[in-house]
């Protein structure tokens, strides 16, 4: 088993922070704007025809769901594209791995960095929904932590995908066949309770669904023991995708 020393992570984070200072305006603009577009276009647009859904205003329902949209876009795509570019085009990882840093430390360090900034980006749609009827609650303070653990697993997923493809254009297959279904089979825009049972079964293996459910529990003040199931699902997802990411990237970079 590859060595993993948590003391190596600050070095990876420092490198990411230095790079982030150069391109943060573009990254932040995109990460914040896309979920807000979903919020205003769908939440307010469809909300003009649908007043309430699942007991809350539709714009509030979509606004809390847009948190997961921000998490998905801000984590999987950096995991895929940034990792592929650094590995294939820039050859950055070759230099990093010539130091005592291992592949596991590198992947975990980069994923945790992306997850940390996604925790901030993911909270923006929630804050933007408050003027439209979302009541501020103490539970909202948990949303950044929910975004972090969700983004960690999704970033690992992006890293794993980047290790599978040989050309960058292949990402379009995963975007259409995997990421789009993850978004729509999650309860972002409509509740899944009234849908066929098989739909609910699929959603139970969807990390975006568990992220949304936890966010809504925190925002609506409905956290309960049942919420622990969603936490467990996200932790297991991160553990699985993290293992897959480290294995495939070790194969690509070392063997």
What are these regions (language model features)?
Residues 1-255:
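Hydrophobic transmembrane alpha-helices and immediately adjacent juxtamembrane helices
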């Amino acid at each position: 088993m590859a060595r993993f020393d948590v003391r190596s992570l600050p070095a990876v984070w420092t490198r990411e922070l230095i790079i982030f200072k150069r391109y943060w305006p573009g990254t932040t603009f995109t990460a914040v704007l896309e979920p807000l577009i979903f919020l205003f276009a769908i939440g307010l647009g469809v909300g003009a025809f649908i007043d309430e859904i699942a007991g809350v205003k539709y714009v509030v329902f979509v606004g809390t769901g847009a948190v997961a949209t921000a998490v998905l876009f801000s984590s999987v795509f950096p995991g895929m594209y940034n990792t592929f570019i650094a590995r294939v085009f820039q050859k950055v990882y070759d230099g990093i791995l010539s130091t005592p840093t291992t592949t596991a430390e590198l992947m975990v360090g980069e994923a945790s960095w992306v997850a940390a900034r996604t925790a901030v980006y993911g909270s923006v749609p929630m804050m933007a929904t408050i003027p439209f009827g979302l009541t501020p609650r103490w539970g909202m303070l948990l949303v950044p932590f929910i975004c972090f653990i969700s983004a960690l697993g999704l970033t690992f997923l992006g890293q794993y995908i980047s290790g599978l493809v040989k050309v960058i254009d292949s990402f379009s297959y995963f975007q259409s066949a995997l990421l789009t279904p993850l978004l729509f089979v999650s309860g972002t825009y409509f509740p899944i309770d009234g849908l066929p049972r098989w739909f609910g079964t699929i959603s139970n293996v969807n990390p975006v669904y568990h992220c949304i459910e936890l966010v809504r529990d925190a925002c609506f003040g409905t956290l309960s023991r049942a919420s622990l199931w969603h936490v467990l699902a996200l932790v297991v997802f991160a553990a699985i995708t993290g293992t897959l990411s480290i294995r495939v990237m070790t194969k690509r970079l070392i063997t």
